């Protein structure tokens, strides 16, 4: 048996998080740190072990490599996430070779009903640098529930941040646009074809 800690959308909203990297700091045993001032990549440490020892899954599939697990943490907007399941401790036999420190499983939103949401955030760091975020979600489902689609989009922009004025930025420049979808089709009551 393994212990699974779950982070849901209410947590993301209460801490005003815009991406997965900002959200993971609110889970015990996890720490997200910036390891390169030039390229600005964050990595997650589970139980103190570095990023390559953490397995990141999307919908229980290992689609994130060790490299994109480093750069991808800021590219996963919280507006596409239903919940995040965190398993601390070794689990290579269950989750994949990188799951030495632990596993982070990102469960994306499934189209359940017709909805639309737009959000925007603007934040400032020490009166020097502004960061803009804009996100949108939409989901459409047929009346008979045979097909549905969920779309998400996010945009983030941040200039480099030099906290101590030494000419090296502690946070690198960030200009990112993310788009994705999750869709399904049910030809019969007991079958489902999905695309993510």
Tell me what each language-model feature is:
Residues 113, 119-121, 136-196:
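Periplasmic-side early beta-strands and strand-to-turn transitions of outer-membrane beta-barrels
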Residues 43-45, 61-88, 109:
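Short acidic/polar hinge/loop motifs at secondary-structure boundaries
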Residues 1-13, 43, 51:
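N-terminal periplasmic "start-of-domain" segments of outer-membrane beta-barrel proteins
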Residues 43, 83, 103, 133-137, ...:
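Membrane-embedded beta-strand positions in outer-membrane beta-barrel channels/transporters
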Residues 24, 84-85, 104-106:
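Non-catalytic regulatory/gating segments with a bias toward low-complexity or hydrophobic composition
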């Amino acid at each position: 048996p393994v212990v699974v800690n779950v982070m849901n959308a209410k947590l993301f909203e209460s801490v005003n998080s815009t991406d997965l990297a900002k959200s993971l700091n609110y889970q015990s045993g996890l720490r997200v740190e910036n390891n390169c001032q030039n390229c600005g990549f964050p990595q997650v440490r589970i139980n103190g072990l570095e990023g390559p020892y953490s397995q990141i899954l999307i919908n229980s599939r290992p689609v994130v490599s060790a490299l994109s697990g480093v750069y991808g943490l800021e590219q996963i907007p919280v507006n596409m996430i239903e919940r995040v399941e965190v398993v601390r401790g070794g689990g290579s036999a269950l989750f994949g070779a990188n799951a030495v420190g632990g596993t982070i499983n990102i469960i994306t939103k499934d189209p359940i009903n017709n909805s639309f949401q737009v959000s925007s955030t603007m934040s400032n760091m020490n009166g020097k640098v502004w960061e803009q975020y804009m996100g949108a979600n939409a989901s459409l489902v047929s009346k008979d529930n045979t097909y549905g689609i969920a779309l998400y989009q996010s945009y983030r922009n941040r200039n480099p941040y030099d906290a101590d004025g030494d000419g090296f930025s502690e946070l690198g420049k960030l200009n990112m646009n993310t788009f994705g979808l999750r869709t399904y089709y049910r030809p019969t009551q007991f079958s489902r074809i999905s695309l993510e």
